[in-house]
């Protein structure tokens, strides 16, 4: 069995939801990197961005990956921007098998609108689709270059996606 499974992909593609389901199916632990950071910092990701800035958050994200380097039998859901840092990309590959959950921009926007989660990088809703496309284009090569497996998630059921992941690990 794989030491760990690391889920990467854009915000709102289902990393947390799918990660929990996958962990249950594999009898693995589940770790949400953003929640891990929120507990360590005693504030939400939105508050960290607002009060301390993105650079501070990215540093805490990198430190969190260091702390998770020894975990085993875990599914780890990363933040959408974790792959921005070359150092983080290297750490993710060392932690476990990296799976890229790929989604279409329109599907991402639909999920964001349905979600109660505040997305710090998408505060202006009128510009959201353009911003999603821009950020996704900037990160796509990082997602693809870091991952061993790419799983399309748009317009698919959770069950279909989980089955696809399990068949590919």
From Swiss-Prot:
Q: What does this protein do?
A: Catalyzes the specific phosphorylation of the 3-hydroxyl group of shikimic acid using ATP as a cosubstrate.
From what organism does this protein derive?
Alkaliphilus oremlandii (strain OhILAs)
CDD domains membership: SK
Q: How is the cofactor bound?
A: Binds 1 Mg(2+) ion per subunit.
Q: Describe the family membership recorded for this protein in Swiss-Prot or TrEMBL.
A: Belongs to the shikimate kinase family.
Q: Which cofactor does it need?
A: Mg(2+)
- Give the protein name, as stated in the record: Shikimate kinase
> Which residues are recorded as binding substrate?
34, 58, 80, 139
**Matches recorded under HAMAP family:** Shikimate_kinase
């Amino acid at each position: 069995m794989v030491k760990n499974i690391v889920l990467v992909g854009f915000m709102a593609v289902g990393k947390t939801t799918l990660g929990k389901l996958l962990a249950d199916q594999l009898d693995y632990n589940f770790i949400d990197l953003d929640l891990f950071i929120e507990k360590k910092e005693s504030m939400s990701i939105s508050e960290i961005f607002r009060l301390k800035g993105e650079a501070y958050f990215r540093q805490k994200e990198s430190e969190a990956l260091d702390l998770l380097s020894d975990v085993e039998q875990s599914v780890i859901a990363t933040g959408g921007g974790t792959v921005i840092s070359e150092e983080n990309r290297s750490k993710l590959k060392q932690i476990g098998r990296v799976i890229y959950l790929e989604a279409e921009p329109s599907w991402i926007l639909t999920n964001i609108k349905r979600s109660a989660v505040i997305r710090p990088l998408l505060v202006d809703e009128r510009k959201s689709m353009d911003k999603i496309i821009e950020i996704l284009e900037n990160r796509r090569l990082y997602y693809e270059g870091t991952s061993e497996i790419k799983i399309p998630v748009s317009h698919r059921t959770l069950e279909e996606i989980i089955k696809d992941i399990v068949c590919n690990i």
